[in-house]
């Protein structure tokens, strides 16, 4: 009999609940969430608590988990070991690591032998995403585009952009579309130099106090256009410079002395030998001159 009821539920598609009974939930991509299911007023044997979901991409109804309400709490758990859905002890449905395809409508029902639905709870789950990329402005500046979006697409009028606790400073442009809010941030003007070099922390505040934080890198430091200041000379540098200069002068002076000495010695080696005075030749010449007289 329970199988027949399940088939009827499968063919019915979306639950036709009142708008007041549908709760909208937002979950950031990659995070976990829980969807409570109220306990039935009376626990009877054979009652089944079932969780269904209907993806955004189609109208089909998918069975997520089904447990008996009179079973011990310790026996509850994942319907599939590889599934990211888990039924907790209070019959809440836990979703681990949300993805885009998890967006859609979820609801829980309690079926008894009379095939009545009791205490159903319907949730419209939307997955929030945050993206950041770089763009070039018409002036050639490197700007950052910060995007906060929701799946399925719905208008996000309640998105607030903050830098720290204050509005975003500098030249910022805001854009809103169906299912997305975009902030274009360019380098700030008129900001002190030391402050402008720090990364900027910008937050996107979304419904139900969900938020994404972005870190916008500081603009690259332009190359210096002025000459670097001359280094300051202290006493130790001056003494070292004088010592090096004195050593250089001494080496040059010694080199000159050695070079002159070697040059003088080389000149003496190249000059012809002077003949020595010979007394006998001079005596002979004097005698010869005396005879001629």
From Swiss-Prot:
<feature type="topological domain" description="Cytoplasmic">
    <location>
        <begin position="259"/>
        <end position="293"/>
    </location>
</feature>
<protein>
    <recommendedName>
        <fullName>Lymphocyte antigen 6 complex locus protein G6f</fullName>
    </recommendedName>
</protein>
<dbReference type="Pfam" id="PF07686">
    <property type="entry name" value="V-set"/>
</dbReference>
<feature type="domain" description="Ig-like V-type">
    <location>
        <begin position="20"/>
        <end position="124"/>
    </location>
</feature>
<dbReference type="InterPro" id="IPR007110">
    <property type="entry name" value="Ig-like_dom"/>
</dbReference>
<dbReference type="InterPro" id="IPR013783">
    <property type="entry name" value="Ig-like_fold"/>
</dbReference>
<keyword id="KW-0597">Phosphoprotein</keyword>
<comment type="function">
    <text>May play a role in the downstream signal transduction pathways involving GRB2 and GRB7.</text>
</comment>
<feature type="signal peptide">
    <location>
        <begin position="1"/>
        <end position="19"/>
    </location>
</feature>
<dbReference type="InterPro" id="IPR036179">
    <property type="entry name" value="Ig-like_dom_sf"/>
</dbReference>
<feature type="glycosylation site" description="N-linked (GlcNAc...) asparagine">
    <location>
        <position position="90"/>
    </location>
</feature>
<keyword id="KW-0812">Transmembrane</keyword>
<keyword id="KW-1133">Transmembrane helix</keyword>
<keyword id="KW-0325">Glycoprotein</keyword>
<keyword id="KW-0472">Membrane</keyword>
<dbReference type="InterPro" id="IPR003599">
    <property type="entry name" value="Ig_sub"/>
</dbReference>
<dbReference type="GO" id="GO:0005886">
    <property type="term" value="C:plasma membrane"/>
</dbReference>
<dbReference type="InterPro" id="IPR013106">
    <property type="entry name" value="Ig_V-set"/>
</dbReference>
<keyword id="KW-0732">Signal</keyword>
<dbReference type="InterPro" id="IPR026524">
    <property type="entry name" value="LY6G6d/LY6G6f"/>
</dbReference>
<feature type="topological domain" description="Extracellular">
    <location>
        <begin position="20"/>
        <end position="237"/>
    </location>
</feature>
<keyword id="KW-1015">Disulfide bond</keyword>
<keyword id="KW-0393">Immunoglobulin domain</keyword>
<keyword id="KW-1003">Cell membrane</keyword>
<feature type="modified residue" description="Phosphotyrosine">
    <location>
        <position position="284"/>
    </location>
</feature>
<feature type="transmembrane region" description="Helical">
    <location>
        <begin position="238"/>
        <end position="258"/>
    </location>
</feature>
<feature type="disulfide bond">
    <location>
        <begin position="37"/>
        <end position="108"/>
    </location>
</feature>
<comment type="subunit">
    <text>Homodimer; disulfide-linked. Interacts with GRB2 and GRB7 in a phosphorylation-dependent manner.</text>
</comment>
